[in-house]
Amino acid sequence: LKILYRNRLIKTNINDFLDKIETEDTPKDYLSVEELYKLAETPCKKPILKTAALFSCLTSLRISDILSLQWHEIIDFAAGGKCVHTITQKTKTEDIIPISDEALQLIGYSPEKTGLVFKGLKRSWTQQPMKEWIREAGITKNITFHSYRRTYATLQGAAGTDIRTIQSNMAHKSITTTQRYMKVVDSNKREASNRISLIRK
């Protein structure tokens, strides 16, 4: 309607007379701490899928970035430890995302490794194979791969991580995007990377 009015195909901007439709945020599923433990403890028929899913929970990486992640993109982090230095597939922006020692252990990191980190992983596995694994873990929520990113944001927030640190670690341009899920100094980002664990304490 706005385009029609702008092009003078109609005389009146109808939008001026329409009531704004109020939208509600649709609740999205994420894993609780206990559910994350269960998932980590449950075998998956596609081991590389399990590793990728848990890595996403620990780092907030999207499936597109998981699929394209190369070993050489894991580099030294200025505040200590390692980080992923990558071009985010969705936004095409350069990002630095710190990763915990546990996440490095999970993927079997070694500086000598080359090529894809999750070699052999198929996007299609995030459908039926992943749903079966989640069901076997006793989780009844509607979990998608993107739910792992939401899990990261929610559990970081619950652990007391500052929202701007979460925003930075998730490579969000706007803090409102981060708020719907649930630049900071490197030391805070590094500390935050260790706050989500797959091991019961």
Task: List each model region and its residues.
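N-terminal core-binding DNA-recognition domain of tyrosine site-specific recombinases/integrases
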Residues: 2, 9, 25, 47, ...
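Basic, Lys/Arg- and aromatic-enriched nucleic-acid-binding interface segment
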Residues: 6, 10-63, 67, 199
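C-terminal catalytic core of tyrosine-transesterase DNA break-rejoin enzymes
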Residues: 6, 54, 58, 65, ...
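Catalytic-site neighborhood detector that most strongly recognizes the C-terminal catalytic loop/helix
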Residues: 30, 88-92, 170-195
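DNA/chromatin major-groove-contacting recognition/catalytic segments
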Residues: 38, 95-98, 159, 183-201
